[in-house]
Amino acid sequence: MSKEVVNTKAEASRVNALAAVRNYKVCPRLEYKTISGVQGPLVIIEDVKFPKYSEIVTIHLSDNTTRQGQILEVCGKKAVIQVFEGTSGIDNKNSYVEVSGDILKMPMSDEMLGRVFNGSGKPIDKGPNILADDYLDINGNPINPQCRVYPKEMIQTGISTIDVMNSIVRGQKIPLFSAAGLPHNEIGAQICRQASLVQGKDVLDHSDDNFAVVFGAMGVNMETARYFRQDFEENGKMERVCLFLNLANDPTIERILTPRIALTTAEYLAFEKEMHVFVILTDMSSYADALREVSSAREEVPGRRGYPGYMYSDLSTIYERAGRVEGRNGSITQFPILTMPNDDITHPIPDLTGYITEGQIFVDRNLYNRQIYPPINVLPSLSRLMKSGIGHNMTRIDHPYVSDQLYSNYAIAQDVKAMKAVIGEEALSNDDILYLEFLDKFEKRFITQNTYECRDIYQSLDIAWELLRIFPEDMLKKIKTDILSKYYPRHHAN
């Protein structure tokens, strides 16, 4: 009897393992040898019976290899297929197309945490295949706006300029605007290492098990991919991170899949496993370039700078998958990273991204050239949902007032610095001298911190008060009198 049970368990395990890796689409399948043309990443087939939009197909090549594709456009009996692994080697004589009859789905399991996948969702860490608990459509299910919960409760990143002045709340989508040569990878990795829930009164679950990071990389080089993977492993954070890596030498079209697969994983962990998921997507500029390549191959009418006219709505299908839902404790917070071509914030990619997302964090080249890390310029940075996640019972009662005062003083100090270059330091007033002192200490003490330095929100606020004490009380007009009387003295009570 015991032997029969063992055999049954072994058989069940084998069947489950096969189910995780097999092509689970409908059977029998139709096969077509009617490839009429190959253009860039696209393959055109003719005489197809009832082709369906977004249907997944398998292309069999003459060397017995297979490639996956997706029907991108249907016109009568003609279908245009977008091939994920590239079209080199596909011909119209020996290659044929097998139609599945289903859309692209991703096997999901909480075992995906701690694993590394390629841009198509296949394991590349030499580990076993995922035993799926469920198969989910990578395009996700639209969230009823009526069922959305307003984002609140702050996520602590350990970086003072973000936590104090551009606070990120659970369920928010806020991008990092960077440029070529700036340390956005280091900032992204640091946030991945340090991100956690603020230990406030309203946080029900303080354990790290309730927090996960999904990292999707698009078009990164081998060095960057190795850096992220090695950083997570060395700092013991890998077990709470799920990595999807599309390298620069991987097919360009795969970059269109990568963010959707990453977000599908995040939705499963957030809404099925009720975890708080922090999603980092880098680099969204590579995604937009892949979108432009497909649009060009389809000979569509180009929009600004050659990007397709529908790029705004396409980006929204990615960014709008962040948020919280009624009846679920989990949340998805998005932190996409994009590099602005030629440092141009008016470029279509950052321009359209800024319309959709709830603020932005700006990485500044001038600060970086002065060896300030992280080189985050707080003046063009903004978090539109910051007010709902800070203050009494969430961080500290003085948080919003300190943030406003820091912004005000830093902006005035920049004006004084520009005026000093014109009229000289001798012509400045005593108040102007205080602002210049504040500017110097703000950049050296508040903005600057070590790559592995994790400041909690209370440490960052205390540093901010040290800087504000440069000024007499009557110059701190953004802070209420009762807050000043409590926190302005050097030995204040928390």
From Swiss-Prot:
Q: Does the keyword Transport apply?
A: yes
Q: What GO cellular component term, any one, is given? A: proton-transporting V-type ATPase, V1 domain
Question: Which SUPFAM superfamilies does the annotation name?
Answer: P-loop containing nucleoside triphosphate hydrolases
Q: Which InterPro entries match?
A: ATP-synt_VA_C, ATPase_a/bsu_AS, ATPase_F1/V1/A1_a/bsu_N, ATPase_F1/V1/A1_a/bsu_nucl-bd, ATPase_V1-cplx_bsu, P-loop_NTPase, V-ATPase_su_B/beta
Give any Pfam family that matches: ATP-synt_ab_N
Entry's PROSITE patterns? ATPASE_ALPHA_BETA
The alphabetical list of record keywords is:
Hydrogen ion transport, Ion transport, Transport
The biological processes this protein is annotated with in GO are:
ATP metabolic process; vacuolar acidification
State the superkingdom: Eukaryota
MF terms from GO for this chain are: ATP binding; proton-transporting ATPase activity, rotational mechanism
Q: How is this protein organized at the quaternary level?
A: V-ATPase is a heteromultimeric enzyme composed of a peripheral catalytic V1 complex (main components: subunits A, B, C, D, E, and F) attached to an integral membrane V0 proton pore complex (main component: the proteolipid protein).
Q: What does this protein do?
A: Non-catalytic subunit of the peripheral V1 complex of vacuolar ATPase. V-ATPase is responsible for acidifying a variety of intracellular compartments in eukaryotic cells.
Q: Which family does it belong to?
A: Belongs to the ATPase alpha/beta chains family.
Can you say what this protein is called? V-type proton ATPase subunit B
